[in-house]
């Protein structure tokens, strides 16, 4: 395509430039052609939307061009473009006609009903913005945080069916209502929303009942290319009166069996009181506490290095991290029961509300950095993890992205791993909740990762007593062709072999979507017919999860 985007829009009657900003090819590639994945794409342009109405106008124009046999453009919406490890701000395809539709300026927040805890947001609303909104307006709610940090979109994570560690851990489950624009220009709203509006009733009941009436269609807008969601209502969790977090260490690697049994039992007994529980292996904890000593060489951590760091930093083979929410008396009683259940097998059990932890924070907070640094590092990590569990976004997980990169880490408060050329891909399969499955899976990850010179860093996020999602960061150096090749080969083998073993990813990056949604899935075949009905000209998100 030789004609620049601005000229293409102008020559075809588009004139709403006061409500959007247009970037031509060079500008767009500079701003958006970046990522942690080392995936190559070529952009035709980008449009930063300031008003929702622009989306419909652009879809109308794109359909006109395609129908007349003129230049075809395909839009790829992003919320903030910080989908690190899955595609960042890149389109699924690189066909020369890809246009980024940047929705980051659509960032209105409307407290629909404080009494019920319902807030309406747009795609550009970040964890940090919502946190600031709550603080400014003295609203007693928790932000549905993720480890990605303050600069990431809340709505985008929900539409990717992501999750966090606060009580409303399933972020799409907490999304009660949405509005979208389809590629043919048609607007979508739920049946409850439309019926309430037509009856002249307050637009509220549809925002409290997720499942609507009749066929449930809202879910078709998640992990799909059906349309552009421009508004959604989410159910918030009020800050509880009581809170405590627990950290349980297991000394030996084979203690993972009793750790999983403890987690299943705890989530089953205390559903709604205990949030999701994370189980992390030794290497994952090391990556949070210390810089990579082999960053310059690109080598795996040796057994000797792991042993040295383990002793110096007091790192266990497995560490459980969880939280308790509720009335103070309830939290106190559940804490006793958790301690009793964990004690027979655990090496250490720590609760953030323990007096000794409070004293340690007070004492070490006044000490110089050189005084017992291992303890100080652990206390800092503890404090940051507590903030996350209380629904306050922070950057505790970001240093992980810099584990293999040789580019100096940003000193700014909010880091951008893509800008810093960090190498990160995610492997995120679902695992059956059973000790045997977890043990087999752990061996699978460690074997494949080491084969490709990748440090195997394993986290199990236990969302319910019957569900585990594992997240494994594939960390590499983008400045090394060999490191990039190893990372992609590693992820490909993890996914392919993992599926054969029953470990199916719940989320895929933009390359994997093309590979695994190749038309053979029955659900994919049904979605193609739906896409054909509403996007006959293929102007929106081609390649996204099989479209």
Placement of each model-derived feature along the sequence:
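Short, conserved charged micro-motifs
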Residues: 54-57, 129, 253-260, 328-337, ...
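Short beta-strand-to-loop capping motifs
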Residues: 50, 248-254, 321-330, 427-435, ...
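C-terminal cap/substrate-recognition region of VAO/PCMH-type FAD-linked oxidoreductases
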Residues: 204, 218, 233-234, 244-255, ...
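Glycine-/small-residue-rich beta-strand-loop submotif within the FAD-binding core of flavoenzymes
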Residues: 90-126, 165-167, 236-237
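FAD-binding subdomain of flavoenzyme oxidoreductases
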Residues: 123, 128, 132-265, 269
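Conserved glycine-rich FAD pyrophosphate-binding loop
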Residues: 36-44, 65-74, 78-80, 85-98, ...
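General beta-strand structural signal in soluble alpha/beta enzymes
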Residues: 21-25, 48, 74-79, 101-103, ...
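Short amphipathic alpha-helices in soluble, non-transmembrane regions
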Residues: 5-9, 58-62, 262-264, 322, ...
């Amino acid at each position: 395509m030789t004609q620049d985007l601005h000229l293409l829009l102008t020559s075809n009657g588009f004139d709403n430039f006061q409500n959007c900003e247009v970037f031509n090819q060079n500008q767009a590639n500079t701003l958006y052609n970046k990522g942690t994945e080392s995936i190559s794409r070529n952009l035709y342009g980008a449009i930063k939307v300031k008003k929702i109405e622009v989306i419909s106008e652009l879809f109308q124009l794109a359909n006109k061009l395609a129908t007349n046999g003129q230049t075809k453009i395909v839009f790829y919406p992003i919320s903030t473009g910080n989908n690190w490890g899955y595609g960042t701000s890149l389109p699924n395809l690189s066909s020369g006609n890809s246009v980024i539709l940047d929705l980051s300026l659509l960032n209105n927040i409307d407290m629909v009903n404080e009494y019920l805890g319902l807030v309406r947001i747009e795609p550009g609303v970040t964890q940090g913005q919502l946190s600031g909104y709550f603080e400014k307006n003295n609203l007693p709610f928790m932000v549905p945080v993720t480890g990605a940090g303050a600069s990431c979109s809340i709505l985008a994570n929900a539409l990717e069916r992501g999750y966090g560690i606060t009580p409303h851990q399933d972020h799409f489950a907490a999304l009660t209502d949405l509005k979208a624009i389809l590629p043919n220009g048609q607007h979508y709203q739920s049946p409850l929303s439309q019926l309430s509006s037509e009856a002249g009733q307050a637009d509220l009941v549809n925002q409290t009942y997720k499942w609507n009436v009749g066929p449930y269609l809202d879910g078709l807008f998640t992990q799909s290319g059906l349309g552009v969601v421009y508004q959604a209502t989410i159910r918030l969790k009020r800050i509880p009166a009581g809170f405590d977090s627990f950290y349980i260490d297991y000394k030996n690697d084979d203690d993972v069996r009793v750790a999983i049994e403890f987690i299943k039992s705890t989530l089953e007994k205390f559903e709604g009181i205990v949030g999701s529980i994370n189980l992390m292996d030794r290497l994952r904890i090391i990556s949070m506490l210390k810089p990579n000593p082999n960053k310059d060489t690109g080598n795996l951590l040796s057994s000797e290095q792991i042993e040295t760091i383990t002793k110096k930093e007091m790192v266990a083979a497995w560490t459980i991290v969880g939280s308790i929410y509720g009335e103070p008396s309830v939290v106190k009683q559940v804490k006793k029961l958790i301690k009793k259940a964990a004690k027979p097998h655990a090496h250490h059990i720590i609760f953030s509300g323990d007096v000794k932890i409070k004293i340690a924070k007070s004492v070490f907070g006044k000490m110089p950095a050189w005084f017992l640094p291992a303890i100080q590092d652990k206390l800092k990590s503890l404090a940051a993890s507590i903030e996350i569990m209380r629904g306050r976004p922070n950057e505790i997980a970001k240093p992980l992205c810099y584990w293999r990169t040789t580019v100096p880490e940003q000193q700014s408060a909010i880091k951008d791993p893509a800008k810093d050329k960090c190498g990160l891909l995610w492997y995120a399969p679902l695992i059956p909740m059973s000790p045997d499955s977890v043990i087999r899976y752990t061996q699978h990850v460690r074997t494949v990762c080491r084969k490709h010179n990748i440090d195997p860093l394993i986290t199990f996020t236990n969302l319910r007593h019957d569900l585990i999602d594992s997240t494994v960061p594939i960390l590499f150096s983008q400045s090394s062709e060999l490191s990039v090749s190893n990372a992609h080969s590693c992820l490909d083998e993890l996914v392919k072999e993992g599926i054969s073993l029953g470990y199916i990813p719940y989320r895929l990056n933009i390359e994997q979507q093309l590979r695994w949604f190749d038309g053979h899935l029955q659900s994919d075949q049904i979605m193609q017919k739906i896409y054909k009905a509403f996007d006959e000209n293929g102007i929106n998100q081609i390649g996204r999860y099989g479209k």
